[in-house]
Amino acid sequence: VEGDTSLILIDTLDSDARAARLKDELSRLTDKPVKTIIFTHGHPDHRGGCGAFRDTVEEIIAFAPKKAVLKGTERINPILNKRTFRQFGYGLTDEELITQGLGIREGHAIGDGVYSFLPPTTLYTEDSVKRTIDGVAFELVSAVGETDDQIFLWLPEERIMCCGDNYYGCWPNLYTIRCTQYRDIAQWIKTLEKILSYPAEALLPGHTAPLIGRDQILEVVGNFKNAIASVFDQTLDCLGRGLTLAETVESVRLPEELREEGKKMHHCVGS
């Protein structure tokens, strides 16, 4: 985002090498430096390139998680890391990897740079913060969903929303097969309803293509929300009836009106 005298960067790519190339591309467009970085959430593929901007950045903004990390989580990190390695196919060749899910392979997985983190200098705990940063109006909104520290950014003058990873063009990881902390699906659905309540004309997700036009945003994000809500409600119903895991898997189906959308998303999964 271009301000009066500087650039405001929303997330930083996933490695120092890729962020350095981004920095070069930005320099061809403007001589304004990146002075502000805003993290949509704490996943490393959104923060890993931050160090490439250490020579100019003055403020790094993030939100604190709405729920504390469960105590003792660090004790299961060895198996979590191993499962993460398997989930994202870090040990596979490009030919062996069928899909990365959300886009191209992460830089550190293929030797294209390493994680280069910088800590936030501004950490908000509020539900919503309005800021004018170098002449650009922002509303930063806490938006629990894929993560408990997730936010979306609303640019009211441009009617643009950056939604982080609470929407992307594939089926979301409602619960990760690598076994991370529980993701609050009911709250995620509420967050998507909140996203839809803003009069955005462009929606920029953290992964996959942007949605342009109010009608497309309402249709695509609305279907995304309704699909999640349907799976969630059906799963709770199965649990209430005492069905086994296998029986639940066989029972849960997307409604007919959402199946075509589901076919577009079923081969991919979020992070």
Residue ranges and their predicted role:
Residues 1-28, 152-165:
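Conserved beta-strand hairpin/beta-sheet module of binuclear metal-dependent hydrolase folds
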Residues 10-12, 35-43, 61-64, 143-144, ...:
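Active-site neighborhood of phospho(di)ester-bond hydrolases with catalytic His/Asp-centered motifs
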Residues 12, 172-177, 215-217:
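Short acidic, glycine/proline-rich loop/turn micro-motifs
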Residues 16-17, 42-48, 68-70, 147-148, ...:
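Active-site environment of divalent metal-dependent phosphoester hydrolases
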Residues 17, 27-126:
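Active-site HxH/HxHxD metal-binding segment of metal-dependent hydrolases
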Residues 123-125, 129-155, 160:
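Core dinuclear metal-dependent hydrolase active-site scaffold
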Residues 147-181:
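Mobile, glycine- and charge-enriched loop segments
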Residues 160, 170, 182-247, 251-255, ...:
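Divalent-metal (often Zn2+) His-rich catalytic cores of metallo-beta-lactamase-fold enzymes
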